[in-house]
From Swiss-Prot:
<dbReference type="InterPro" id="IPR005225">
    <property type="entry name" value="Small_GTP-bd"/>
</dbReference>
<feature type="binding site">
    <location>
        <position position="91"/>
    </location>
    <ligand>
        <name>(6S)-5-formyl-5,6,7,8-tetrahydrofolate</name>
    </ligand>
</feature>
<dbReference type="Pfam" id="PF12631">
    <property type="entry name" value="MnmE_helical"/>
</dbReference>
<feature type="binding site">
    <location>
        <position position="242"/>
    </location>
    <ligand>
        <name>Mg(2+)</name>
    </ligand>
</feature>
<dbReference type="GO" id="GO:0046872">
    <property type="term" value="F:metal ion binding"/>
</dbReference>
<dbReference type="Pfam" id="PF10396">
    <property type="entry name" value="TrmE_N"/>
</dbReference>
<feature type="binding site">
    <location>
        <begin position="282"/>
        <end position="285"/>
    </location>
    <ligand>
        <name>GTP</name>
    </ligand>
</feature>
<comment type="similarity">
    <text>Belongs to the TRAFAC class TrmE-Era-EngA-EngB-Septin-like GTPase superfamily. TrmE GTPase family.</text>
</comment>
<feature type="binding site">
    <location>
        <position position="257"/>
    </location>
    <ligand>
        <name>K(+)</name>
    </ligand>
</feature>
<dbReference type="InterPro" id="IPR027417">
    <property type="entry name" value="P-loop_NTPase"/>
</dbReference>
<dbReference type="GO" id="GO:0002098">
    <property type="term" value="P:tRNA wobble uridine modification"/>
</dbReference>
<dbReference type="InterPro" id="IPR031168">
    <property type="entry name" value="G_TrmE"/>
</dbReference>
<protein>
    <recommendedName>
        <fullName>tRNA modification GTPase MnmE</fullName>
        <ecNumber>3.6.-.-</ecNumber>
    </recommendedName>
</protein>
<dbReference type="InterPro" id="IPR006073">
    <property type="entry name" value="GTP-bd"/>
</dbReference>
<feature type="binding site">
    <location>
        <begin position="238"/>
        <end position="243"/>
    </location>
    <ligand>
        <name>GTP</name>
    </ligand>
</feature>
<keyword id="KW-0378">Hydrolase</keyword>
<feature type="binding site">
    <location>
        <position position="130"/>
    </location>
    <ligand>
        <name>(6S)-5-formyl-5,6,7,8-tetrahydrofolate</name>
    </ligand>
</feature>
Length: 462
C-alpha cells in the first residue's frame, strides 16, 4: 500500500501508568502539529511547522485557557511518511507520573473528536502499509516478551519481516505456478501439455508442502520461546516443592511450613532458564483428602500434570518410597520428567535402585544442586537438535500455526487429486485456496473482523 489512508488524528499515553522517570503522550494524524502547537511553547517561540522532522525540542506544555505551565518537556516531531504510522507524529516526553501525563492528554483531547483505541497506532501502521499483520503481532509479542531469547529469536525477527518474506515469496511462487498451469491449459493443441501440467503441479505442490511442514516443525520451539516451558512440580505434601519454587525464583513466593497441604492451589511463576521462559506451576500436593478446598487444588494439580511440557517430581530421599511416591512415578512416567531427590542434607533412606533415570539429588534447604536442574532442562529441550538456531524463522503464534496447518491440508488435497488422476483445472481450486490461506497470515486476505479483534488485544497507546 503506497498511499497513506486518511484518518482522524488520535492521541494516547504511550508509557505505563504510574510513577516513572518519564511519560510519553503520543499524537498521530494530519492535525498532530496543529494540535500540539496549541499547548506547546518552544524555547525560542519557533512554530512547530517550521521545525525539522525527527528532532527533539525543549519547551513547556501550557494550559492555553489559564496560561499556566504544566510541565517542562522534550517534544519529538516526526513527519509523514517516515514514521511508524506513516502519519505526522508528535511525542511529548514529560516527567513521569499519571497526574501530569493525564492532564496533558486531556488538553489534547479537548481539541479532538477521537481518542485512540487500544492498538490503534499499530493498526494504522498496518492499514497504511508500514507493517503486515505478522509484524503487527510481533509488536505485541515484543511488549510481552519474558526473556531475551524470545525477544531476539522470535519477536524481533518476525518484526524484521522474516515470516512476512517467507510467506510472500511462497504466495508469489504459488501464483506463478497457477499462471503457468493456466497457460498450458489454454493451449491444448500441444501433445505434451497435459503431462507437463501434471508434472509441474506435482513438483511444485510437493515443494510447497515440504516448506510449510518444515515451518510447522519450528512451532514447538517457537511456542516454548513465546509462552514458556510449562513445568509442573509434583510430589506428596511437604517434600519441598514450594521451597524449590522459591529457590528457582530466588525469592519467597510460596508459603513454606511443616504443615501438610499448605499449598492449596496452583501457583504460576516465570523464571529465566538460560534465556528460555520456564512457567513454573507449583501444584498442591497430590493426596487423598477430605478438605474441600484442598481437594480442588489436588484436581487442578492433576490437570497441570497432564498439560505440562516438563514434570519435576520431588521425592523425600530421607525416607523410603511410599505408595504415594510410587503412584506419582507411575503417573508421570510418560512425561518429560526429572526426578529430584530432596533432603540430601539428611541421612538417605530412599531405594535409589528402584528409581528411573534422570535423577538429581538436591537440598532445597541448603540450595544444593539447583543449578543442575537448570542445566538438565536446557539439555532436554535445547541441546543439539533442539538448540535455538539464530537464522531460523520460528512459528510461535497459534493463529499462524493453525493457518499453516490448513495450507498443508490444501496442498495434500492437490497431491491426492493428482494421484487419483483428477483434471488439473479442478485441483487449481485447492492450490488457490492455499494462496488465500497464506494471505490471511500476512493480512493480505484477512477479514476486517479478524483485524479488529487482533488489534483490540494491544495496550492503549501502542
Amino acid at each position: 500500500m503506497s498511499i497513506t489512508k486518511e484518518f482522524d488524528t488520535i492521541a494516547a499515553i504511550s508509557t505505563p501508568l504510574g510513577e516513572g522517570a518519564i511519560g510519553i503522550v503520543r499524537i498521530s494524524g494530519t492535525d498532530a502539529l496543529k494540535i500540539a502547537s496549541k499547548i506547546y511553547r518552544g524555547l525560542r517561540g519557533k512554530d512547530l511547522s517550521a521545525i525539522q522532522s525527527h528532532t527533539l525540542n525543549y519547551g513547556h506544555i501550557v494550559d492555553p485557557d489559564k496560561n499556566e505551565i504544566l510541565d517542562e518537556v522534550m517534544l519529538g516531531v516526526m513527519l509523514a511518511p517516515k514514521t511508524f504510522t506513516r502519519e505526522d507524529v508528535i511525542e511529548i516526553n514529560t516527567h513521569g507520573g499519571i497526574a501530569v501525563t493525564n492532564e496533558i492528554l486531556q488538553l489534547i483531547l479537548a481539541t479532538m473528536d477521537h481518542n485512540a483505541e487500544p492498538g490503534e497506532f499499530t493498526k494504522r501502521a498496518f492499514l497504511n502499509g508500514r507493517v503486515d499483520l505478522t509484524q503487527a503481532e510481533a509488536v505485541m509479542d515484543l511488549i510481552r516478551a519474558k526473556t531475551i531469547k524470545q525477544w531476539i529469536y522470535v519477536s524481533l525477527k518476525q518484526l524484521d519481516g522474516s515470516l512476512k518474506t517467507l510467506i510472500n515469496n511462497t504466495r508469489q511462487e504459488i501464483l506463478n505456478t497457477l499462471a503457468q498451469v493456466e497457460v498450458n491449459i489454454d493451449y491444448p493443441e500441444y501433445d505434451d501439455v497435459e503431462e507437463m501440467t501434471t508434472t509441474l503441479m506435482r513438483e511444485k505442490t510437493q515443494e510447497f508442502q515440504a516448506l510449510m511442514e518444515n515451518l510447522l516443525r519450528t512451532a514447538r520451539r517457537g511456542k516454548i520461546l513465546r509462552e514458556g516451558l510449562s513445568t509442573a512440580k509434583i510430589g506428596r505434601p511437604n517434600v519441598g516443592k514450594s521451597q524449590l519454587l522459591n529457590n528457582l525464583l530466588r525469592e519467597e513466593k510460596a508459603i513454606v511450613t511443616d504443615i501438610e497441604g499448605t499449598t492449596r492451589d496452583v501457583i504460576e511463576e516465570y523464571v529465566n532458564i538460560k534465556g528460555v521462559p520456564l512457567k513454573l506451576v507449583d501444584t498442591a500436593g497430590i493426596r487423598d483428602t477430605d478438605d474441600i478446598v484442598e481437594k480442588i487444588g489436588v484436581e487442578r494439580s492433576k490437570k497441570a500434570l497432564e498439560e505440562a511440557d516438563l514434570v519435576l517430581l520431588v521425592l523425600n530421599s530421607s525416607e523410603p518410597l511410599t505408595l504415594q511416591d510410587r503412584s506419582l512415578l507411575e503417573l508421570s512416567k510418560e512425561s518429560n520428567r526429572i526426578v529430584l531427590l530432596n533432603k540430601t542434607d539428611l541421612p538417605q533412606k530412599i531405594e535409589v535402585n528402584e528409581l528411573p533415570e534422570n535423577v538429581i539429588p538436591i537440598s532445597v534447604l541448603e540450595n544444593e544442586n539447583i543449578d543442575k536442574i537448570e542445566e538438565r532442562i536446557n539439555d532436554i529441550f535445547f541441546d543439539n537438535a533442539g538448540m535455538v538456531e539464530h537464522d531460523a524463522t520460528y512459528l510461535s503464534n497459534a493463529r499462524h500455526i493453525s493457518l499453516i496447518e490448513k495450507a498443508v491440508d490444501s496442498l495434500k488435497a492437490v497431491n491426492e487429486g493428482l494421484e487419483l488422476g483428477m483434471p488439473v483445472d479442478l485441483l487449481q481450486v485447492d492450490m488457490t485456496r492455499t494462496w488465500e490461506i497464506l494471505g490471511e497470515i500476512t493480512g493480505d486476505a484477512a477479514p476486517d473482523e479478524l483485524i479488529t479483534q487482533l488489534f483490540s488485544q494491544f495496550c492503549l497507546g501502542k
